[in-house]
């Protein structure tokens, strides 16, 4: 039985996450009151027909905090296993999402959206600390979020339970704050100075071929892959559920994208749970 609670910041993708879980065969309920968890758990753990349940929860309200903790205590006392997925995103991305949907943040009242986001982060900080998986959706599309959840909850992956998130970025836009490991690939020849490659990105085959034709690129990728594979079991041993590997070049469009994709392919081929995203590929 997999009993999953999905919560997090408003606008971080809870609805999309539940849709993804439903596609994976989970019985999903959105906006589920935490106080009813014990009854639902009793029902499903005794059922032979349902073995995967995902509950979407809004935990902003004061009473909900008391309810969720008492309900989690009930699950522990009855040896009911559960997992918590916490979704979050950067302030900038959340503000953009609220503006695009023309929705008001539930905690902003008449104030600014960012004030509501800050208040919600404070209220949810404790539940975030006990989450099994924390997923930053700032740079994830719906399909990438689905892939990340699939890597966690579908069987057959090496070191199931840890997600390897490979990210490319441009140093001119800053190092990703969420990165656990950062690697600088500005030592590689830059496709930017090749006229026909400048308007392309590392997702294009011509740029990929240019970057990976250099011996130093091939050797770097091999050594990087070996190091990551060496480290993963130790991160798992320490209870880490997500490893964010950031690959940086000057603008985040050519070298870092090509190397991030190559690292993703290398790890994916060996059946690790891995996703890739390119933070700055659309920047000018």
From Swiss-Prot:
Claim: Metal-binding is one of the keywords in the record: no
Superkingdom as given in the UniProt entry: Bacteria
Pfam family of the protein (one): RapZ-like_N
InterPro entries assigned to the protein according to its UniProt record, in alphabetical order: P-loop_NTPase (IPR027417), RapZ-like (IPR005337), RapZ-like_N (IPR053930), RapZ_C (IPR053931)
Record-listed GTP binding positions: 58-61
Key words, A-Z: ATP-binding, GTP-binding, Nucleotide-binding
Keyword Nucleotide-binding applies: yes
GO molecular function: ATP binding; GTP binding
Residues where ATP binds: 8-15
Function comment: Displays ATPase and GTPase activities.
Protein family: Belongs to the RapZ-like family.
The name this protein goes by in its record: Nucleotide-binding protein TTE1834
Biological source species: Caldanaerobacter subterraneus subsp. tengcongensis (strain DSM 15242 / JCM 11007 / NBRC 100824 / MB4)
């Amino acid at each position: 039985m997999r009993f999953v609670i999905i919560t997090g910041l408003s606008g971080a993708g809870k609805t999309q996450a539940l849709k993804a879980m439903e596609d994976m065969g989970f019985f999903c309920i959105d906006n589920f009151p935490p106080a009813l968890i014990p009854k639902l758990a009793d029902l499903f753990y005794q059922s032979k027909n349902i073995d995967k349940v995902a509950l979407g929860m809004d935990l902003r309200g004061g009473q909900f905090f008391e309810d969720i903790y008492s309900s989690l205590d009930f699950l522990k006392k009855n040896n009911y296993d559960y997992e918590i997925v916490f979704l979050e995103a950067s302030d900038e991305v959340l503000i953009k999402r609220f503006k695009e949907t023309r929705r008001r943040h539930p905690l902003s009242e008449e104030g600014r959206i960012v004030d509501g986001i800050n208040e919600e982060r404070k209220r949810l900080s404790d539940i975030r600390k006990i989450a099994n998986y924390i997923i930053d959706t700032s740079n994830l599309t719906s399909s990438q979020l689905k892939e990340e959840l699939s890597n966690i909850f579908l069987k057959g992956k090496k070191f199931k339970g840890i997600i390897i998130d490979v990210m490319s970025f441009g140093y001119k836009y800053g190092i990703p704050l969420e990165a656990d490991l950062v690697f600088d690939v500005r030592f590689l020849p830059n496709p930017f100075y090749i006229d026909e490659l400048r308007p392309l990105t590392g997702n294009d085959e011509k740029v990929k071929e240019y970057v990976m034709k250099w011996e130093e690129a091939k050797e770097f990728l091999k050594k990087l892959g070996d190091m990551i594979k060496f480290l993963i079991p130790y991160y798992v041993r320490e209870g880490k559920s997500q490893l964010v590997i950031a690959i940086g070049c000057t603008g985040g469009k050519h070298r870092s994208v090509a190397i991030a994709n190559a690292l993703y392919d290398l790890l994916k081929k060996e059946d690790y749970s891995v996703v890739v995203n390119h933070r700055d590929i659309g920047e000018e």
